[in-house]
């Protein structure tokens, strides 16, 4: 599914493990890059962090915080740190600085930038229920929304070629800085491999035989039965390309195997 993580496969199940997403992280899902948005509290906590680290650093120290593209410099001062913008205009205190953070604001400190989400509209029946997608920028989403999108992509990727039973993916579980998705594979019933021996020697020696195995080459066996390239996102066509490529490789491998047998006759 083009996701960054580790996929572990077995015959009937699998797991996909990735780093747990946090505010400010970026992730690409189905070819689109998303950024994990934050709450106002998360963003103002970043400013508090700068102030605390400045106080711990002591005399002669400064820390830079950026709010909506504007830089503010915190300078250590016994009895209370001072704050000024890039033009030298003083900011009264830390609470005044934090008051500049609104919905849609970006706050940067120490290489990390958080974007405060504006998420009032959404998928509720009243049209005003938060849906985990920023109302002004659809590329900014919550970590929970990102997990839903990842689950959907893993489900789509694992259902290519399934006919009799569809694959399912459980909700991602966070633990120890990792998020794990459990995958239950689907399947398509296919014909058994045809296997027989050709006797090529002049005597009854059992070594004078060539074993021939022919796999079924129908659409279900090739994993392309019911394959669709139609959806709103274009992802179905993307996964179809891989499925068709795998099918071509399987047919080519079977032809190669039969050609090798023919050359021995």
Question: What residues fall within each predicted segment?
Answer:
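Polar, low-complexity tracts enriched in small residues
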Residues: 1-264
